[in-house]
Amino acid sequence: MREEPTAGTADATLNKLLQAADLSGYESDLRRKLKLRNAADLQYVEEVDLLSVGMSRPEQKRLRKEYTKMFPSGIFGKVKKAFKRAESLDRKTSNSVANQDDNDHHVIPIEKITLCKELGQGEFGSVWQAGWKNSAGSDVIQVAVKCVGSDKLLATSSSFLQEAAIMTRMRHEHVVRLYGVVLDTKKIMLVSELATCGSLLECLHKPALRDSFPVHVLCDYAEQIAMGMSYLELQRLIHRDLAARNVLVFSPKLVKISDFGLSRSLGIGEDYYRSEFTPNLKLPIAWCAPECINFLKFTSKSDVWAYGVTIWEMFSYGEMPWKGRSGAQILELVDRKKELLTRPKACPEDIYDMLKETWTHQVQDRPTFSDIVAKFPERRAQSVRAVVDCKDSAADHLHFKKDDLIVVISRSPAQYPDGYYWFGSLRNGKLGLFRPTDTVAHLGSEPPCSNGTIENGFSEKEKGGKKNKKAEKESERERKKLLISEPVGDVRHTCHVGIDGTAFGLLQLDKKAMCPTSSSPSTSRGSQASPAPSHTSSSTTSSVHLRETVARNGVPIKETMSLRDVGPLSRDALNLRDTVSPPVARAPSQPPSYSQPRPPPRSVSSVSSGNQHSVQVHDQFSSLDRSRGSLTPTAPPLTASAANSLKDPLTGISLSIPSNNLISYMDDQEDDHRWTRSPGAISQSTTLTALSSSRKDPIPAPRGPVAAVYARGKDIPTPASKSDIALCEKIEDLNRDLTNYSIGTICDYSEDRPLLDSMNRTISSSTTHQPPPQSSEARIRFMTEQEVRKINEKSAREHRKTEDLLREERQKEQKPGEIEEPQQPAESLYSTRTPQQEGWSSAAQEAYKLLVECGTNLKQASVSPPPMSPTSSRLSTLDRSSISPAPPRPVTPPLSVRNETISMRKSQQEEMEHVTVEENSPKRVHIIETKLIDGPARGMSPIQDRHIPAFTTPMSNGSFRKAPAPTPVSPAPAGSTDQKPPPCRPPKTRQFPLVIDERNLAYDNLNGFGAGARVAPPVPPKPKVRTIFSFADDQKKQKEVAN
């Protein structure tokens, strides 16, 4: 029955609590009305009870505050802490007593040991559970007693006691403690700790406990065994018989090594190993190293071999190593053939790699237990967490739910060597395949727990339901802390690296490129100015700086920028700038995707003597031969070629700086903005010589990564730098759109040079041409009226100039004597000017009528006249005859107008029709068609001339129709019959079909519609004999000229 606390103790605790809360006046009411005896009873008091005694809410708040101070974890937590303190005091007392007993008495009297029941039989004897009554008190401790027969003890009692004294001083959490020995005439008893769960081999063989030993628990056991053996190794003790049967299980998470040192103490030696070859004994030869079998040489390295076999035995769940083989066969396989045990199904790949190292045939090549413990966290099986539920129908697949942990055993199982499925184990011990895409990495494996407590079983079902729920909630919170959360806020999931090492996404994306507007780098090439370390950095060698103020681009305060480690450049050769780079430009720390050939060095305009900054880039970049690490995880490593490209001096880049974009610098203390535009007066020290041409060379892409610092403090000076100003202005120039036209961009052209200049142009230091100011903000603007007027005037001047040149070319082509063609006599017939005749004779009229009849018969034939000679008139005179049956009228030959006028006969009253063809430029060609419509006529082929544009004129029957063949015979005087045209090449003809609209037959080109019906067409004139004779005379002259 629980003891009640005394009144004095109760009054003291309650009175102390009320005095601390300044509520002593409520003590009598709390004791009398609420029946409180001590301060601990306040945990059962509710707010309504305190209100009933008149305590206000502020007073209740003060009472709760003082109560929390007195009982931090509640009354039950206080009681547990008290019990723990008492238990620790008892443990210390017992330890001190035990130590005293161990130091003074290693031998335990036999009357203090009471054997209870036999636990099993071993190689050296039987094992019993017994009670040991300690001399320090009356309590009885449950211990394990191993009884060894005197016939098996070959050594003397004194040496055995010396070894027992050494073993009793061993203190380790994973080594079974030996309390002492009991000496008797018949047998010797070894008193040690009691493991109620038995040996590890027995637990692995029990099917009911198979689920209690999943893969992750076995990994913990392997590490604990290695830690215990490492302790024995440091104590220079050799186990000689390490196996799963000698590993005791104290709890589901704790194992300890037992029976260490007994092989040497018991003196088994050669007789023991000879007995292994007999068929009646269990042979531990499968756990022995080759040197132990061949030379009976036991060392810590032989224990390492046995440790590997023990771990293999554990992951195979108690299977016998080299099962079915004799000792001689095992020695043949291990010593001569050097074969190894195959990997168990539940053994992770990394653990099996460690086992193969322990089975190295050469003793010196095996690792020590200290090495195994140091490297074991890296070899521990990795766990993944399921993100979806999986219930595959396949029998060899795992069935798991979301948030279940899976231990990865193999990433390339034999069924799926491509890694599409992995092989793993659930927490309940089930093995099977699963898809890695259904899982995520689980950060932080559960550390091995060794609380040193002894439990009676592995089941935890005895706990209450409420306690289990609370534990589940706490474990859920712990699991959530170990997982990577989803992207929150503006964070973007740009890339992912899987548990198997595969990655996808934007791995090369610089995080500075994801900012609203990134900062452009600017490296100070000057050797005179070295920036001071930023006071925002924790170390002077750190390349990560914090931004002091809000930048102009909207970067928040104290934003950390990751930078590359560029050695000396991070402290001496880098200045911090706040220039604005193009929004769509590539991040400076990201290397270009192509390599550009190295351009020849070019000269840079010299600056004024007031501010001379030497450009010594080659010396500063000479230390970049080494490979460098990067603080930015997404940035690629620096290659050797990229490091060599950084050595090249940047003096080869020629930049032009407009006068309105020059930059002056102000003190950091006066203005937070480091750079200030000054469109007016420009400082002489910051003025650079610009290009003489308004067109600027494009900046070639960098050939390697660019190291840059993106933030700086106020205490870093900002000297004027040529490269900074040039880079800033060139970026602004590139920002301007090509649609921002001006007079210089439209009218500045030439046919004898390309539109884009080469990049090798040198800058003339004598010329200081400054382009007109242009605003960087206005990308597209309207042209002013003055600019439009200037453009029109210049265009008109260019057109007039072109017309003059074209007219001169035509005049040169029409000069006589340059080009001679045999068709000139035939063409001269149409251009020969005949004098005007006053009348027609009767013979001429008869001949003309005959010619008209011949033309009527040949009206269907459409033969083009021979081409005209370039020496002839530009536009020939076309004789048109009237089609009307009215009386004939005399023909008035028109005057030849040079190049521009076409003369035609229209009526008997000697009217002339002048058609003027105006050609202003080669771009505009006016084709004027003059039509005299006639019903039977169907058109006429145009004159083919390569110097004049073709035009079509429908004519009457027989007019302007000359066949290229010999001229038809007409009635003429005798003198004209034997005159034949000279032999010549037939002219090139091209037929152009002419379509006449019958609905417009009444249309006249001069008088309009209906005029043709009212005015009768004229009578065809009578040809004159002199005209025919002129044709023969011209032919005769041409022959004479040709001869």
From Swiss-Prot:
Residues 113-379 form the Protein kinase domain. InterPro entries: ACK/TNK-like_SAM (IPR055175), CRIB_dom (IPR000095), Kinase-like_dom_sf (IPR011009), Non-receptor_tyrosine_kinases (IPR050198), Prot_kinase_dom (IPR000719), Protein_kinase_ATP_BS (IPR017441), Ser-Thr/Tyr_kinase_cat_dom (IPR001245), SH3-like_dom_sf (IPR036028). The active site is at 241 (proton acceptor). Residues 785-812 form a coiled coil. Its EC number is 2.7.10.2, 2.7.11.1. Keywords: ATP-binding, Coiled coil, Kinase, Magnesium, Metal-binding, Nucleotide-binding, Serine/threonine-protein kinase, SH3 domain, Transferase, Tyrosine-protein kinase. Residues 610-624, 825-842 have a biased composition (Polar residues). This is Ack-related non-receptor tyrosine kinase. GO terms for molecular function: ATP binding; metal ion binding; non-membrane spanning protein tyrosine kinase activity; protein serine kinase activity; protein serine/threonine kinase activity; protein tyrosine kinase activity. Residues 458-481, 790-818 have a biased composition (Basic and acidic residues). SUPFAM superfamilies: Protein kinase-like (PK-like) (SSF56112), SH3-domain (SSF50044). Disruption phenotype: RNAi-mediated knockdown in a gap-1 mutant background causes a hyperinduction of the vulva in 60 percent of animals. In addition, suppresses the slow germline development of clk-1 mutants. Probable tyrosine protein kinase which plays a role in vulva development, probably by acting as a negative regulator of the let-23/EGFR and let-60/ras pathway. Involved in the negative regulation of germline development. Residues 484-498 form the CRIB domain. GO terms for cellular component: plasma membrane. ATP binds at residues 119-127, 146. Residues 443-481, 514-644, 790-842, 859-898, 932-993 are annotated as: Disordered. Residues 516-543, 630-644, 870-884 have a biased composition (Low complexity). It catalyses: L-tyrosyl-[protein] + ATP = O-phospho-L-tyrosyl-[protein] + ADP + H(+); L-seryl-[protein] + ATP = O-phospho-L-seryl-[protein] + ADP + H(+); L-threonyl-[protein] + ATP = O-phospho-L-threonyl-[protein] + ADP + H(+). Belongs to the protein kinase superfamily. Tyr protein kinase family. Its cofactor is Mg(2+). SMART domains: PBD (SM00285), SH3 (SM00326), TyrKc (SM00219). Residues 379-444 form the SH3 domain. One of its GO terms (biological process) is negative regulation of epidermal growth factor receptor signaling pathway. The gene is ark-1.
